[in-house]
Regions:
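Histidine/acidic-residue-rich catalytic or RNA/ligand-binding cores of hydrolases
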Residues: 216-221, 246-266, 284-289
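Short acidic/histidine-rich active-site segments
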Residues: 235-241
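Active-site mouth of glycoside hydrolases
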Residues: 1-210, 232, 244-259, 270-275, ...
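Alpha-helical scaffold elements lining the catalytic groove of polysaccharide deacetylases
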Residues: 121-125, 215-221, 225-226
Length: 289
């Protein structure tokens, strides 16, 4: 079992720093890792002290930071200071012993047609992923690449497009890196989809946020071993609540504790159960360390 946790982005000047941890952002400002290096290092030291070996960290999210766009809306490459921030993150991961699961993009990337076009063409892979892998592909501080977080929350994007993009990214990562590849599946019921050979994944990932008000919204992981899913690859519970008492308004979590998830993972043959989130970036709170 892999002891892991969702970082998933820093807190900068008291605010969640979603999409702005790496490089210049669309507001022509910089709030990346190197802008608060000591705080990030302290976070990793705390995770290491708590026994975590991998942390899941979002990189380009919805395209607001870390990448450059031409005046016409075409993806042109990584943003200024991106490599400064990622160099620092990789060094901190290496020195702390907490490796990185880097989430390349979030499902919100798919909300804009120009951003989708960058995935449907070779732009993202050739102009963003390739330079990234050329610099970090051989670095063992990176445990894995999560190509896209929860794409099943954007079913409007054709599944053939999703398979083609993730498959191409996976091929490029495997060509240039020893790191593993996954997709952050947003629903338990989607697990079988990620096992399709088109994605080229090394392990399958599902996220579990059961809601007592809507028991039919998704399947449950409880009462099931990883083998019960009938997958050809290992299965990770990549996100789960830290505390059943901490949840957003309008969401009613069952009484499963983080200890229950970890016991399920241990006894059920899962790769692990990674709580959301170390930085308490939303109402689901943070686990006790």
């Amino acid at each position: 079992m892999i002891p892991g946790i969702n970082y998933p982005w820093t807190i900068f000047q008291g605010r969640p720093n979603y999409g702005c941890d790496f490089g210049w952002n669309k507001w022509n400002s910089h709030a990346g890792v190197t802008a608060h290096l000591d705080e990030v290092r302290a976070d990793f030291e705390s995770m290491a002290s708590a026994g975590y070996e991998v942390t899941r960290w979002f990189v380009f999210t919805d395209g607001r930071g870390g990448v450059d766009w031409s005046p016409g809306g075409e993806l042109s490459g990584v943003a200024d200071r991106f490599f400064d921030d990622m160099d620092a993150a990789v060094e901190i991961a290496r020195s702390s012993g907490v490796r990185l699961c880097l989430v390349l993009i979030d499902f919100a990337w798919l909300d804009d047609p120009l951003r989708r076009a960058a995935l449907e063409s070779a732009a993202f892979i050739d102009r963003v992923l390739d330079p990234f892998l050329d610099r970090y592909g051989g670095d063992d501080a990176i445990h894995s690449y999560d190509v896209i977080n929860e794409p099943d929350w954007r079913p409007q994007w054709p599944i053939d497009n999703l398979r083609a993009f993730v498959g191409a990214a996976s091929n490029r990562i495997h060509l240039k890196s020893r790191a593993l590849v996954t997709v952050g599946g947003g629903r338990v019921r989607s697990a079988k989809e990620w096992d399709d050979a088109a994605y080229g994944l090394d392990f399958i990932q599902v996220h579990s946020y059961p809601d007592l008000r809507y028991p039919d919204r998704d399947e449950t992981v409880f009462g099931r071993t990883a083998a019960d899913f009938g997958l050809s690859k290992p299965l990770l519970i990549g996100e789960c609540p830290s505390d059943p008492r901490a949840h957003p308004d309008g969401h009613l979590s069952p009484a499963y504790t983080l200890a229950d998830y970890l016991n399920l993972a241990r006894e059920g043959g899962y790769l692990g159960a990674w709580p959301w989130s170390f930085k308490a970036v939303d109402a689901f709170g943070a686990p006790a360390l």
